[in-house]
Regions:
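Short glycine/threonine-rich catalytic loop with a Thr-x-Gly-x-Asp
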Residues: 29-30, 66, 225-228, 265-273, ...
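Generic hydrophobic/aromatic pocket-lining and core-packing "Φ" positions
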Residues: 34, 71-74, 289-293, 361
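Glycine/charged-rich beta-loop-alpha catalytic/anionic-binding loops adjacent to active sites
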Residues: 16-23, 55-57, 138-139, 272-278, ...
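Radical SAM [4Fe-4S] cluster-binding motif and immediate context
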Residues: 265-327
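Glycine-rich phosphate/dinucleotide-binding loop and adjoining beta-alpha-beta core of small-molecule
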Residues: 2-8, 46-245, 303-476
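Positively charged, low-complexity intrinsically disordered leader regions
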Residues: 1-53, 227-267
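Short, small-residue alpha-helix embedded
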Residues: 403, 483-522
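Charged C-terminal helix
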Residues: 319, 524-554
Length: 554
């Protein structure tokens, strides 16, 4: 996969570094990292100011190698004519880095009260950073855990408050470009969390415009919610990539779609391209059926068979006369969009569609038919599912699913074993939406463990968890994609992919996760194409899918 971004956890990176460090190459590794960091800053300065000479660069310097990288880079930038300032935040400082920056024309100050440099008040350091062209966040690296503390934490808080509501990278802005050194300080390196965050805020982290990371991307640069603080990610090769092993997180890029998207040949007939069965929509929500059908038809599936109430069937046929209404042989199912059994009494007309969902899901599992289970289907799942069943909840739906599963485990220990995860933060011990949004990877993994299914957790960064530790994190759509019905279109697109590659999906338990990531990528890019830079509707996203796919395949 040519464009794929691979994320490796802190332990993997340290293990890959170890042979080089043992061989005495620590100084060379740091020089490569600092050189790559300085080069990235030079590019930012040229783009913003047209030159490096005279530009102001402030480095927030912590302890250890992260601070050393920052100090060496500041020395290199000073040698290029930049007005470099190193702000030390701790008594401990990387000795070789400090020596290098002192040999240059860079100025060194401290806010930690030590005698290593000129002492300045915290407010002075914040003012210098706020007035700079570039700020380097070199406070914490991959060996740190938790929020930034002490003087560094106060710097992050105060500077972050000044910058939080501003557009830092707009053309002509006088505000600094924040460049994170390896990772934004204070994020959860391996799980993408924001320690200490309340209500989704990024108060304990200085959000970066660019993160220059060394050797390989780290999970926090790809996973939500921390990915929102990383900005654009640049990977600097420092020489240990071959020793990294299996990635912890994968992000597919547009160049990867062609290797996974099913393309028909001259002799391919409609049945070979896949037949998707669709159980979606109700009399109250016929639009969900139309949107899911649109996603599937426009993603190129060979045929769609629709099962549902007459009013929804008529709406589907009006939009897509090629859809066949009625049961029949299918290669995959897409079920549940627009159906909410938790809100419908048994006497409601919706009950017939709910029972249809139950029957189809049982049939799919019994006969090894790949299935997308969305919305209403999530409340009807059996105890265990194969990985070729893909669940597609948003955060609220995943919270409800997990709450129900964990309560069942506590009330039926004889069936599931004693113990298990602790209760949630809700007043009744339920898992809350806020918990899922704060730790998406954790809860998506738990859902996979509890059900056996592949889990696609929808969000600004969509997280996919599959068997054998497979994790994908896709951030392809604009914020405008958060609109009614967009998830129904995604259900149809993914259903089309599963139908087109059904035999392979059943044979290879990891393929469903890869196809789910591809569906999220195409769905997000279709939203961009539907109306670049502006609002979109779900139907417009579906309409943009064919051209989006064509562009990705050529």
């Amino acid at each position: 996969m040519s464009g794929v971004i691979l994320g490796y956890d802190a332990h993997q990176v340290r293990e890959a570094e170890e042979p080089l460090l043992t061989a005495g190459a620590e100084g060379e590794l740091m020089h490569r990292a600092a050189f790559g960091l300085a080069g990235a800053v030079v590019r930012e300065l040229v783009a913003r100011r047209g030159r490096v000479r005279g530009a102001s660069v402030v480095g927030l310097v912590g302890t250890g190698n992260n601070g050393g990288d920052t100090l060496h880079a500041l020395a290199m930038l000073a040698d290029r004519g930049a007005r470099a300032l190193a702000v030390l935040t701790d008594e401990r400082v990387h000795a070789a880095g400090l020596a290098a920056v002192r040999r240059s024309s860079a100025r060194v100050v401290t806010v930690s009260g030590t005698g290593q440099a000129e002492r300045v008040w915290l407010g002075e350091a914040v003012a210098e950073a706020y007035a700079a062209d570039v700020v380097l966040d070199g406070l914490l690296g991959i060996g740190a855990r938790g929020v930034v503390r002490g003087s560094g934490g106060e710097l992050v808080r105060l500077l972050g408050e000044l910058l939080r509501d501003e557009v830092r990278t707009a053309p002509g802005t006088d505000l600094p470009c924040v460049v994170a050194v390896d990772v934004p300080s204070g994020v959860g390196i391996d799980d993408g969390t924001l320690p200490g965050a309340v209500g989704g805020a990024i108060g304990h982290v200085l959000p970066a415009d660019v993160t220059v990371t060394f050797g390989a991307a780290k999970p926090c640069l790809l996973l939500p919610p921390a990915a929102a603080a990383a900005g654009r990610v640049e990977v600097v090769d420092i020489g240990f990539r071959p020793g990294l092993g299996v990635p912890t997180v994968v992000r597919l890029e547009p160049a990867d779609v062609a290797a996974l998207w099913p393309v028909p040949g001259p002799a391919t007939h409609k049945y070979a391209r896949g037949v998707l069965g669709l159980v979606a929509g109700t009399a109250a929500y016929p639009g969900a059926a139309v949107l899911a059908a649109s996603g599937a038809v426009l993603a190129g599936v060979g045929m769609v068979r629709y099962l549902g109430p007459d009013v929804a069937a008529r709406a589907v046929l009006a939009a897509h006369p090629e859809v066949v209404v009625g049961d029949g042989r299918v290669q995959a199912w897409a079920i549940g969009s627009g159906v909410d059994p938790t809100l419908m009494p048994a006497t409601d007309p919706t009950a017939e569609q709910v029972e249809r969902l139950r029957r189809v899901l049982a049939r799919a599992v019994a006969h090894s038919v790949p299935t997308v289970a969305d919305a209403g289907a999530l409340a009807l799942l059996p105890d265990r599912l194969p990985p070729w069943v893909v669940l597609t909840p948003h955060a609220g739906e995943l919270a409800r699913l997990l709450t129900a599963r964990l309560r069942e485990r506590r009330t039926r220990p004889e069936a599931h074993g004693a113990g298990g995860p602790a209760a949630g933060d809700g007043p009744d011990g339920s898992i809350t939406r806020a918990q899922v949004e704060a730790e998406p990877l954790r809860w998506a993994r738990l859902a996979h463990d509890l059900t056996g299914a592949t889990v696609l957790l929808k969000g600004a960064v969509t997280v996919v968890v599959g068997p054998q530790g497979a994790v994908y994190a896709q951030a392809d759509g604009p914020a405008w994609l958060a609109t009614a019905g967009a998830g129904d279109v995604l259900t149809g697109v993914l259903g089309a992919l599963l139908a087109s590659r059904a035999t392979e999906v059943v044979e290879d338990p990891t393929l469903a996760a890869a196809l789910a990531a591809v569906a999220a990528l195409v769905h997000g890019r279709a939203a961009h194409h539907a109306n670049p830079g502006g609002p979109v509707t779900a139907l417009a996203v579906a309409a943009a899918v064919p051209a989006t796919v064509a562009g990705l395949l050529t």
